Each structure stands twice: as C-alpha cells, then as structure tokens.
Amino acid sequence: MKKQASLLFLLALLGLGTGYAQEKRKLTLKEAIEMAVQNSTSADLATTKVKSAELALANTKNNQYPGAKISGQYMRLSSANVKSNLQSNSSSEPAAPLKVDQLLLGQANVTMPIFSGFKLKNSIKTSESLYKAETFAKKHSNEAIGLEVVELFASLYKAQQMTLLIADNLKTAEQRVKDFTAMEENGLIARNDLLKAQLQVSNIKLALDNAKKNAAVANYELITLLKLPESTIVDIDIEAIKKDMAAHPYQKSEGERNDLKALSLQKAAAESEIKVAKSNYYPSLSLSGGYIALDLNNVLTVTNAMNFGLGFSYDLSSIFKNGKQVQFAQSKAKETSLALEQLNEQVKEEVFQANENYNLSLKQSVVYDEAVAQASENYRIVKDKYDNSLSTTNDLLEADFEQLQAQINQALSKADVAQKYYELQFASGQLLNSLQLTQN
C-alpha cells in the first residue's frame, strides 16, 4: 500500500510539472510591438545601418581639417664620394677628403585644402542626406515589424477563438450522440440518424485538431519574433486593443510614410553626387607649411628650415574622362527620382486599398452579428421541431453547423476589423503613432 501511495504521489507531481511547463503570458498589442522592435534581428540591422551612415558622415567631415604628417629617415652611407662647392677656395692646397657615412632627415608637413570645386562641401551634403535617409528607413522598418506583430496577433486570436468555439460545439455534439444512442436503443430513432451524429462528432474533432495546430503555429511564430521562451503561450488582451482603436481613430494623412522620406533623401544625396562628379572639372588648391631638419655627416647641417606655400593641382585627363562619371551620377539620380515617383503611386494605392478593406470589414462585422442571431434562432426553431418529430436529423445537424459557422465568422470578423484598422494605419505611416509608441 505504501508503494502504491508513493507511486501515486510521484505521478501527481509529474502531472503538476507537466501542467506548469507552459507559461501563459497576457500581452497587449502595444507591449508586443515594443518587444519586437527591441529584440528583433531586423530592428538591430536597421540600427546598425544608421550607425554606419553616421560614421560615414563623420569620416567625410574629417576631410575638412588639415592633414599633418611627420617623417624621419636615418641612412648609412658606404664610401660616398662627396664634392662640395661650399668648401673654401682660399687655400691652394687640396682639401682633405670628407668622410660622409650617414644622413639624418626629419620633416613635418601640414596641408589645408582651400578649394576643390566644392567637392568636399557636396560630399558632406551627400553623407548627411544618406544618414537622414537611414534614420527614416529604420523607422519604416520598425513600422513593418509592428505590422508583422499585428498579423501574427490576428492569426493567433482567430485560431484561439476557433479552438474555443469548436471545442464548445464538440461538447454539444458529444452530448447529442449520447442522447441519440439512448434513443436508438429504445427504438425511437433509426440507427442511420445515430451514425450521422457520430460522423458530425468525428468531423468536429478533425476541425478542432486543425484549429489547435494553427494556434500552436501562430503562437510559436509570435514568441520567436518576440524572443520569448518556447514554453510561453500568449494570451491576447483583446480589450486593450479595442480601447486603443477607439482612442485613436484613423485620420487621413499624406506624406507621412517614412519609406517615402527615406527615398526622398536618397534622391537628394544622388543630386549632390552629381555636383561631386562635376567638381573634378575644377583645379585643387591647398595651403601647405612644414619644417625640415637635415644632417649630412661632416658636410651639411640644416635646422629651423620652415616652409609654407600654396599648392595647385589639376588633372587634365578629367576634361576627357570625367564626362562619363557625371553621366553616371545623373543616371543614378534619375533612377532614384523614378523610384520615388513609383513609390508615391504605390503608397496611394496601398492607402486606398487598405481604406476599402477596413470599411468592408466594418460592414461585414455588422452582417456577421446579425447572422449569429439568425443562426441561433434558426437552430432553436429546428431543435423544437425535431423534438416534436417535425424535422429530420439532417435538418438539426445542418442548423447546428450553420450556428457554429456563424459564430466562427463573427469571431473572425472582430479580428479582421482590428487587423484591417492597423493595416490602414501602416499604409498611412501612422501605425506606431496610433499606439503612442515613440521612435528614436
């Protein structure tokens, strides 16, 4: 008896362990999007691109400052034959040969660019535009991550609601089978009617298994995106979503899409690149200054040799070669301009379509609410008729199926309204703003 009691206790502990293996976590849409933006690889990539563009801008700006170099050389000379015109000619006797066996040379130079056809100025403008473009691209990336969370939330909620409704319907169907079994045993109904009820139970079980699978897949995709433990089961706070939607109704706004702003800045950068290419037609001027110290052993020592001057350079070949570079820059600018025009048209189409989809979902939701009331009343009437032998088993099972379908459509339509609402906010570039999420 003691062994049996111990075994039962262990089994109970195992059962408790299994029950608590999965952690249920209630999440609002706002919380989930915040987590995704902070933890997702896409967000990290966008942040890294912004940092790279910022460093590229700083690197370009560094070219404004003077360049400074120092150098030194020490060389050993072997049997150098040195003749110097600096030797005195006052003596008629030949000078003793000089022993020159080493050379010391030290230099310090500073160069300051003055003019290069405004190349540096326009290069900085290009880098600034690209940096700003990456910041807006990052914001659009965050919006896209938010939309992905919305879609996963909708999929998970639909699957969870279907699971609940089908499971509830399964209980009713199983109870019907029990009732029909008793009636069949008492000769009140034909065996064929019992088989139809049993077949309905089998079909409902298959639908329930499929709904559970869909819920598990949607839940796994969501927790993977949010970087949550695999044992987490997300419980969607649908009431918080309804409050957010009511508090922030859609407001039409054009020109707010961050991808449009990013591409517009890329266009500005491409136009600056044309000026950079054209700057090669101009000469370059620079100020330079330096210091030289030299010691040629037993011959010459130079110290405090300061120098300064103006540097001038001009690449004559640029007259012939630079034309293609300018044409290339102009072609890239035109390419960006056409891409911006295309994106503008695409955004207008997306906003229009998203608006139509949202309005349709609202209308469908009203119809599905009416359908639930109609299907429930129809089932009640058919059930009364069946109980009074005025309708067939087929009529009863069909009415039950129509009621379940109406309930499922109603639940799915509520999720569709929320999904289409946030898709419209995304198309208008206001998804994160509608949830009062600030972007850095």
Predicted features and spans:
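Acidic, low-complexity, intrinsically disordered peripheral segments
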Residues: 6-7, 20-22, 230, 409-440
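Small/polar, glycine/serine/threonine/aspartate-rich low-complexity segments that form flexible
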Residues: 23-24, 71-109, 233, 239-244, ...
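Short flexible linkers and secondary-structure junctions
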Residues: 22-151, 285
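Sec/SRP-type N-terminal targeting helices
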Residues: 44-48, 61-62, 114-142, 192, ...
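Bacterial Sec-dependent N-terminal signal peptides
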Residues: 1-29, 37-40, 439-440
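Bacterial Sec-pathway N-terminal export signals of envelope proteins
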Residues: 20-69, 73, 226-271, 344, ...
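A short glycine-centered flexible hinge/capping loop motif at secondary-structure junctions
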Residues: 184-188, 386-390, 427
